[in-house]
Regions:
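C-terminal "cap" of GNAT-fold acetyltransferases
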Residues: 132-145
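Short amphipathic alpha-helix that is part of the acyltransferase structural core
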Residues: 1-31, 35
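Conserved acetyl-CoA-binding loop-helix of GNAT-fold acetyltransferases
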Residues: 76, 82-95
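Conserved GNAT acetyl-CoA-binding A-motif
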Residues: 96-110
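Conserved beta-strand in the GNAT
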Residues: 49, 54-63, 68-75
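Short strand-loop junctions, especially beta-strand C-caps/beta-turns
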Residues: 74, 79, 103-107
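Active-site rim helix/loop that mediates acceptor-substrate recognition in acyltransferases
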Residues: 23-53
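Conserved active-site alpha-helix within GNAT-family acetyltransferase domains
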Residues: 107-132
Length: 145
């Protein structure tokens, strides 16, 4: 398994990854393409694709922050889900990084329940520590005069 970093939205593979991102997450959890392009310009942000040989398997978007990595999105190609690729990806990511923050929502709907189940096999612990992460969406406020 290999991870390849992408820093240019014009890259064909980035486009493939972004398409997977769009079908894998609810719209409220996504940033727009423009906001994503802004994130790519930040050296702390990593957009990596996941490969098995020549086969595109998925993506991982994460931030290198003060002493830890914050996984923002992890998605596996729909045809490969349930095959163990996601677990292997997370295992490889954990091997190359020491402190990882993986945020999941409280398990109240199908998607959050599946996410909680996926991460339950890993040595992640629940914490009450508050961290500040870069926002997913750019907020623009209009002021009327």
């Amino acid at each position: 398994m290999k991870f390849i970093r992408h820093m240019d939205q014009k890259d064909d593979i980035f486009q493939k990854a972004f398409s997977l991102y769009q079908v894998s997450f609810p719209e409220k959890e996504q940033r727009s393409l423009d906001d994503h392009i802004r994130a790519l310009a930040d050296p702390r942000f990593f957009c990596e694709t996941i490969w098995e040989g020549e086969q595109f398997c998925g993506l991982i978007f994460y931030w290198e922050l003060s002493g830890f990595q914050y996984i923002e999105h992890l998605a596996i190609e729909p045809s490969l889900r349930g095959s163990g690729i996601g677990s292997r990806c997370l295992e490889e990511f954990c091997k190359r990084n020491q402190k990882i923050v993986l945020e999941i929502d409280p398990p109240i709907d199908d998607i959050s329940i599946r996410r909680k189940a996926f991460t339950s096999d890993w040595a992640f612990t629940t914490t009450d520590i508050i961290i500040f992460i870069p926002p997913i969406k750019r907020v623009v406020r209009r002021i009327s005069c």
